Swiss-Prot record:
Swiss-Prot/TrEMBL GO biological process terms: gluconeogenesis; glycolytic process
Region Unknown, annotated ranges: 407-771
Reaction(s) catalysed by this chain's protein: (2R)-3-phosphoglycerate + ATP = (2R)-3-phospho-glyceroyl phosphate + ADP
Compartments, record wording: Cytoplasm
EC number: 2.7.2.3
Descriptive protein name: Phosphoglycerate kinase
Region (Phosphoglycerate kinase): 1-406
Species of origin: Mycoplasmopsis pulmonis (strain UAB CTIP) (Mycoplasma pulmonis)
InterPro entries linked to this entry: Phosphoglycerate_kinase (IPR001576), Phosphoglycerate_kinase_CS (IPR015911), Phosphoglycerate_kinase_N (IPR015824), Phosphoglycerate_kinase_sf (IPR036043)
Length: 771
């Protein structure tokens, strides 16, 4: 297994990080920030662990001095610093004293970007040819090397393989791990139906991919210029369209063997010339392209066919795709007139729910970004060529050169000297030795390690918390804490997959985990959680705050406000609190509350109480207060533990004008009415216990009826004016009296001795919006 970034001690180390900052440019303007954004997590990770960061990257191809003037990495500094929320230093050298001096001045957490590594290609292609001296020089600038440039992982350059071969410690960054995980899942854990869409200009670029992927897919849709080679092989006229004559034989044999899986264009958008053209359609014979015409894009009938095989068609018995891989455009997307086929692919995939979709290739990604549909795809690869070579089971030199986790440096150094990088990437970084990894034994090896890549139960909850629906961190990386200096923020669910820990989830990059499911509408759903007594108090207090009036003035506009006016106002507030259901429905969720037996009052203190929505103080409910001429010194906490619950009764009308809460087992409790003012309802405080303190507004007790337990003594106070302050002390009855009361109370269900003896947690229900 390859070393990961979490295996390294980064504190106060000079950390060389190879990134892929090869952003698309239009003049001097960056047209897509995706590659910069994807680099941020690794930089942040090193920053937070005290590393001194030296960044290397290329930008485009540099063949002449004119290219050098246009391809300076200084263009990305501002965007990088903005996304990183940290200053970024820049040195316009790839080697020299100026660069070395800047590195020596770095402090932990500092970030330094050096100039475009491909400027060295002006010196006998030193970078692209992996010049040994250049690799050694760059390696000498740091203590640790991290390769996080998946886009160049299929190339052996001085800035990846050269550095990794000459430095003591090397590891893979977060982006590379994410990429490998996504492609591994695509090829080895795909759900059927599996639809692959391949476009682009050349069959020769994708022959190996075609041969590798065809056995795994249910349908293979071929578009772009490469489709014309297959049409030509079938004897269909393609006019002056581009095709590869030397691949006709391959296309013929491929179609003969897999014709039942392959979907080719059945009509075309044509043009007489390549530039400044408008689409023309051959309505008489849509399949044929007349002479002197060029195929520029797929036609409307092909678009309809693409939609059917991606989204499904019940009439034709075609199921919606569950796994999709797309690489390469359907037409000449440089011109807006010929983007329809590619846009149709984006539209179809984005409408799927619960499917796993992977996209690679710059042109395909550009179309997705044009529609701002990135979040509707499971994974958008930063490496088009690298992703194809990964699927082809080829060795990716930039990753293969990284140290194995099990290797000592001496073993690794010996391997470097012999240049024995023979690990086949078809078995993604999971073999203990290089000899185990060959494409021939890959299937057997993968099956033998099935337990490592079992799907997590919560896998579909986003990428549930970069909550990139594209990236599901549930199946990334490995679990064990591998270094005392770094907390293990990665856990394993397959040979090369892991999950970000709480530490990383709370960083600035929670967007690394994203929700794949797209909800078409919000629904009100119940959730249930277990709470302790303290949690319930907090929840009740929060609930009361949320259902309170916004201002005192709206609650009590005047001191002369009538009791009926207050009730009407509070009911409107209640409707706002439950916008999608009536209060009667909420009341129905309150059936019966479990009680604590009188025989187990001492043990009851360790048990949590049962509450439902109806137990929370309702905004317009009136209370029955049981008064007694004599009070005892029992604390409220003891009474609460003995009586366990209040039972909501007598909810007679929808507007709750006569609602009462009976507390029949608190017959000696006493509310003493004193001063009532317009704003304060003070908390009950007795002994060592106090209920959550809140304002009169918060409790929404706009209507209050205090009644005694004795029916003959009950009297309703109507039209009271809220002009005095109430200070209420709830005093309890003696334990013996309470036990007798509960024993004699036949209107309530008493728990059996067995039920009381068994510890139990009760549940508190609330309603929340599903996002």
């Amino acid at each position: 297994m390859k070393k990961l970034i979490t295996d390294l001690n980064l504190n106060d180390k000079k950390v060389l990080i190879r990134l892929d900052l090869n952003v698309p440019l239009k003049g001097k303007k960056i047209t897509s920030l995706k590659r910069i954004e994807e680099s941020i997590p690794t930089i942040k990770y090193v920053q937070e662990r005290g590393g001194k960061i030296i960044l290397l990257s290329h930008l485009g191809r540099v063949k002449t001095k004119e290219d050098k003037e246009k391809k300076s990495l200084s263009i990305v500094v501002e965007a990088l610093a903005s996304l990183l929320n940290s200053p970024v230093k820049f040195v316009d050298q790839t080697r020299g004293k100026k660069l070395e001096s800047a590195i020596e001045k770095l402090k932990p957490g500092d970030v330094l970007l050096i100039e475009n590594t491909r400027f060295e290609d002006l010196n006998n292609n030193a970078e692209s040819n992996n010049d040994p001296e250049l690799g050694k020089y760059w390696a000498s600038l740091g203590d640790v090397f991290i390769n996080d440039a998946f886009g160049t992982a299929h190339r052996a350059h001085a800035s990846n393989v050269g550095i990794a071969s000459n430095i003591k410690e090397s590891a893979l960054g977060i982006l590379v791990q994410k990429e490998v995980n996504a492609l591994w899942k695509l090829m080895e854990q795909q759900e059927k139906p599996f639809v692959a869409i391949l476009g682009g200009s050349k069959v020769s670029d994708k022959i190996n991919v075609l041969e590798k992927i065809i056995d795994k897919v249910d349908r293979l849709i071929i578009g772009g210029a490469m489709a014309y080679t297959f049409l030509k092989a079938q004897g269909i006229g393609i006019g002056d369209s581009i095709y590869e004559q030397d691949k006709i034989e391959f296309a013929t044999e491929f179609l003969k063997k897999y014709n039942h899986k392959i979907i080719l264009p059945i009509d075309h958008a044509l043009a007489k010339k390549f530039k400044n053209a408008k689409p023309i359609f051959n309505n008489e014979n849509p399949l044929e392209i007349p002479q002197t015409f060029i195929g520029m894009d797929v036609g409307p009938k092909t678009i309809e066919l693409i939609h059917k095989y991606i989204k499904g068609d019940t009439k034709l018995g075609i199921s919606p795709a569950k796994t999709i891989f797309w690489n390469g455009p359907m037409g000449v997307t440089e011109f807006e007139e010929f983007q329809s086929g590619s846009l149709a692919v984006v539209e179809a995939i984005s409408q799927l729910v619960g499917a796993y979709s992977v996209v690679g290739g710059g042109d395909s990604i550009a179309i997705i970004e044009k529609l701002n549909a990135q979040m509707l795809f499971s994974h958008i690869s930063t490496g088009g060529g690298a992703s194809l070579e990964f699927i082809e089971s080829k060795v990716l030199p930039g990753i293969d050169a990284i140290q194995n986790y099990e290797q000592t440096y001496e073993q690794y150094d010996s391997q470097v000297q012999s240049q024995d990088f023979s690990q086949n990437f078809d078995s993604p970084l999971v073999e203990e030795t290089f000899s185990q990894s060959t494409s021939e034994n890959f299937s057997d090896f993968a099956s033998s390690t099935q337990e490592h890549f079992a799907t997590s139960e919560n896998q579909n909850t986003l990428i549930n918390n970069y909550e990139n629906p594209g990236f599901d961190s549930q199946d990334m990386f490995k679990t064990e804490e591998q270094n005392d200096s770094t907390s293990s923020f990665l856990t394993s669910t397959n040979p090369f997959s892991s999950e970000f820990s709480n530490e990383f989830k709370t960083s600035d990059f929670q967007d690394l985990k994203q929700t794949q499911e797209t909800e078409t509408q919000e629904t009100l759903i119940p959730h249930t959680f277990e709470y302790t007594t303290d949690d319930l108090r907090h929840t009740l207090e929060q609930y009361v705050r949320e259902t309170s009036f916004q201002t005192r003035e709206s609650t009590f506009p005047t001191e002369e406000a009538s009791f009926e006016t207050l009730e009407e106002t509070s009911f409107q507030t209640l409707e706002e609190s439950f916008p999608t259901q009536s209060f009667e429905q909420v009341e129905q969720t309150s059936e019966k509350n479990m009680e604590v037996s009188t025989e187990n009052f001492e043990n009851a203190s360790s048990q949590t109480n049962s509450f439902t929505v109806s137990d929370i103080p309702k905004t317009t409910s009136t209370f029955e207060d049981l008064e007694t001429p004599e009070t005892q010194n029992t604390t409220l906490e003891e009474v609460a533990l003995e009586t366990s619950n209040f039972e909501a009764q007598n909810l007679e009308t929808p507007n709750l004008q006569t609602s009462n809460f009976e507390t029949s087992n608190l017959e000696t409790s006493n509310f003493e009415t004193s001063n009532f003012e317009t704003s304060t309802f003070e908390s009950f405080n007795t002994g060592n216990f106090s209920t959550p303190s809140s304002t009169f507004e918060d409790l929404d007790l706009q209507s209050a009826t205090f009644q005694t337990n004795d029916e003959s003594e009950r009297s309703t106070q109507e039209n009271f004016e809220p002009t005095e302050v109430i200070e209420s002390d709830l005093l309890a009855m003696k334990t013996t009296e309470l036990e007798q009361e509960i024993t004699n109370n036949t209107s309530r269900d008493i728990l059996s001795e067995d039920e009381v003896a068994a510890p139990h947690k009760k549940r508190f229900w609330f309603f929340g919006r599903k996002r």
